[in-house]
Amino acid sequence: MQTLYPEIKPYARHELAVDAPHVLYVDESGSADGLPVLFVHGGPGAGCDAASRRYFDPNLYRIVTFDQRGCGRSTPHASLENNTTWDLVADMERIREHLGIDKWVLFGGSWGSTLSLAYAQAHPDRVQALILRGIFLCRPQEFKWFYQEGASRLFPDYWQDYLAPIPAEEQGDLMQAFYKRLTGADQIAQMHAAKAWSCWEGRTATLRPNPQVVERFAESLRALSIARIECHYFVNDAFLEPNQLLRDMPKIAHLPGIIVHGRYDAICPLDNAWALHQAWPNSELQIIREAGHSATEPGLSLIHISE
């Protein structure tokens, strides 16, 4: 059975100052003369790790990874200042220019699919193709499904833990209730809310329980950046106009794309991918039978696609 490509070290690392106070971490690995591919991580707020480079043949690809504003090795940690979708789109373009890349392939999952689509629609002449997983279009019904009512009926036991930091009288608008705590001055309440938010995501990300995934989401620094940045984006509708990503698909209708989605994705239901595929005739949709949301499940298919 094929697994991820072997671990590789970056051949170049960059610290790129963008809008104050942010400094982005960017690295390059694989072949300096290869086909450029940008790994666009999820969250927002999740950051990259060593596995992010391992979906691509290092002999064929020039692999670029970066930590988006406020997370991973970018600084300052969990900062919400000057942190919007369009700031991140501008960052991607700065990275492309800084590295002297003409066009690149975008490889993004979950929020990474959102951001890849937003970038491609803003800069279609700079994109060669898109490989997207776990499609997230940031529509109101998607936020409601996962953070207010929907997925709660699939995981009532995990949902109870998600609700724990929020008093009953504030549970009518859970995203706002979490946002109040995640941006408040009480650091203990902030961390309690962050872990509840992040662990809800980690526990529901896989079809079969995966303690390693949950542990990763429960780590304090990661939980704080995921929860603060995600909640900041989502209470602001991801800084998108209603249905913007589907509405603007004609801008990238000419670009080839592959959409990979787990049939049993409880975080981003399959109809997200279906709607995107219907709006994008030049795309191919691959539904992974025994998979949920996490990249650890459809990973093998993603490797075959990158080949």
Which residues are covered by each model-predicted region?
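Conserved HGGG/HGGXW glycine-rich cap/lid loop of the alpha/beta-hydrolase fold
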Residues: 20-76
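Conserved acidic catalytic loop of the alpha/beta-hydrolase fold
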Residues: 86-104
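A catalytic-pocket lid/entrance helix-loop region that shapes and gates access to the active site
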Residues: 127-176
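Catalytic histidine-centered segment of alpha/beta-hydrolase-like enzymes
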Residues: 291-302
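Conserved small/polar residues in nucleotide/adenosyl-binding loops
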Residues: 303-307
